[in-house]
């Protein structure tokens, strides 16, 4: 059998996710190898493997952020960022660190909050 967007929505909600109709369609398009608009079981397994990987990665990000948010104020300083990245297995040049800070530090306060951090990391 095949899984439609409606059925995928039911499955995702049972897993504690709350995707929109558009997100469900994107998920199906992402793994719909034969382009028929539904996903079969192997395609479904591929999708679930990606989702689990994303979830684990987000947990890793939270953990890394917590480790380097020394005073628990919800920010990591620009100086701490290279240590965070190394901790996540990302070896970066000074230029790359500067670029991330420029991208992430929206309010130009020299610190990166958790949301800014996740946005940059998920874009990698």
UniProtKB/Swiss-Prot annotation:
Ca(2+) 1 binds at residues 2, 7. Ca(2+) 4 binds at residues 105, 107, 109, 111, 116. Keywords: Calcium, Metal-binding, Methylation, Repeat. It comes from the Eukaryota. Not detected in the organs tested. Pfam families: EF-hand_7, EF-hand_8. Residues 1-18, 19-54, 56-91, 92-124 form the EF-hand domain. Ca(2+) 2 binds at residues 32, 34, 36, 38, 43. The keyword Repeat applies. GO terms for molecular function: calcium ion binding; enzyme regulator activity. SMART domains: EFh. PANTHER family: CALMODULIN (PTHR23048:SF53), MYOSIN LIGHT CHAIN 1, 3 (PTHR23048). This protein may have four calcium-binding sites. This is Putative calmodulin-3. It comes from Solanum tuberosum (Potato).
């Amino acid at each position: 059998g095949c899984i439609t967007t409606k059925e995928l929505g039911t499955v995702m909600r049972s897993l504690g996710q709350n995707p929109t109709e558009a997100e469900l369609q994107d998920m199906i398009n992402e793994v719909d190898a034969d382009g028929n608009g539904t996903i079969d079981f192997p395609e479904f397994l591929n999708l679930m493997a990606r989702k689990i990987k994303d979830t684990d990665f987000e947990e890793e990000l939270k953990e890394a952020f917590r480790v380097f948010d020394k005073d628990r104020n919800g920010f990591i300083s620009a100086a701490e960022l290279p240590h965070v990245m190394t901790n996540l297995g990302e070896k970066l040049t000074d230029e790359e660190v500067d670029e991330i800070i420029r991208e992430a530090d929206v309010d130009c306060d020299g610190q990166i909050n958790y949301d800014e951090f996740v946005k940059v990391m998920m874009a990698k």
